[in-house]
Regions:
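Single conserved hydrophobic/aromatic residue that forms the stacking wall/gate
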Residues: 1-13
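Anionic group-transfer/hydrolysis microenvironments
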Residues: 12, 129, 149, 194, ...
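Accessory nucleic acid-recognition modules appended to NTPase machines
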Residues: 38-39, 43-201
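Amphipathic alpha-helical "lid/sensor" segments that cap RecA-like P-loop NTPase cores
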Residues: 15-55
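Catalytic cores of nucleic-acid endonucleases
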Residues: 184, 208-252
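Short secondary-structure boundary/capping segments
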Residues: 3, 17-19, 26-27, 134-135, ...
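Short amphipathic alpha-helical segments and helix-helix/interface helices
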Residues: 25, 171, 219-223
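Conserved beta3 VAIK motif of the Hanks protein kinase fold
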Residues: 204
Length: 258
């Protein structure tokens, strides 16, 4: 690694070449991690495979199993959820959005659809935990895609929110490492993830890139926590921004080196 002195403070820049790793990471962001797709010869074949997988899951695992006739409504609810990964969930808001688009669907039906998507392993949820109140909150949980490739096939919006994609990746990675993952509420701020595994507990904030304004928010929220559990900020930045005992990790480093 290389150390630089900037305005009286020392910063660490990781000295490494990530050409191949960055290409693989970009590929994963776009096409996800279903094993079969790695054996396909080109991007067109991968896209076709993911389309076919989506159709099989929606038609066989959801529509036929639960006797759903309103195919358009089902698909639109799923697309809306995947356009809004990492955002607080409200069935009432989704129902209102669908109604405004000329599609009659009740809040209860939205909730049923969400249960079906979880059952089919299209979506995973993270409950919200009030850190000061020490209680799980019964509403506004968050949902994440079980695979980003499948998510990118289904979503409607062309806007790419890298912050939310990174958040989704970190959520999946911590689940794969055996952690229970919750979203933390701290007064009017949020901790992206509280992770538990046995007696272990740690906190994580996730960002795509950390601007000076972002740095205060991402690190500041963690600095407000009055305990000694490990705290991490994960982003794509190559500059090590660790401060006050809070560890900054580059996202590729984080994925390659648990």
């Amino acid at each position: 690694e290389i150390r630089l002195s900037l305005v009286g403070s020392e910063m660490c820049i990781r000295d490494r070449t990530y050409t191949s790793d960055e290409k693989l990471f970009a590929d994963y962001l776009k096409y996800g991690g279903f094993p079969q797709r790695f054996f396909l010869p080109d991007e067109h074949s991968i896209a076709t495979y993911l389309d076919d997988l989506y159709e099989a899951i929606v038609v066989r695992d959801v529509m036929l199993r639960h006797g759903i006739r309103e195919q358009t409504a089902l698909r639109n609810v799923l697309a809306f959820l995947l356009d809004n990964i990492g955002n607080p969930f409200s069935a009432r808001n989704i129902s209102g959005r669908m109604v405004s688009e000329g599609m009659k669907i009740s809040t209860a039906t939205v909730l049923n659809y969400v249960d079906y998507f979880k059952e089919a392993f299209i979506l995973l949820n993270a409950s919200r935990y009030d850190i000061k109140g020490k209680a799980l909150l019964s509403s506004t949980e968050k949902y994440y895609a079980v695979d980003l490739g499948l998510r990118n096939v289904i979503k409607k919006s062309e806007k790419l929110d890298s912050n939310k994609l990174y958040e989704n990746i970190v959520y999946l990675e911590m689940r794969s490492r055996g952690y229970e993952v919750q979203v933390g509420k701290l007064d009017d701020t949020e901790i992206d993830f509280i992770c538990y595994r046995g007696n272990e507990k740690l906190y994580i904030q996730v960002a795509y890139l950390i601007t000076p304004a972002d740095e205060e928010r991402e690190f500041g929220n963690l600095e407000r926590l009055n305990d000694n559990y490990p705290k991490y900020v994960i982003s794509s930045d190559l500059v090590d921004l660790s401060r006050n005992g809070i560890i900054h990790r580059n996202i590729i480093d984080f994925l390659l080196n648990p």
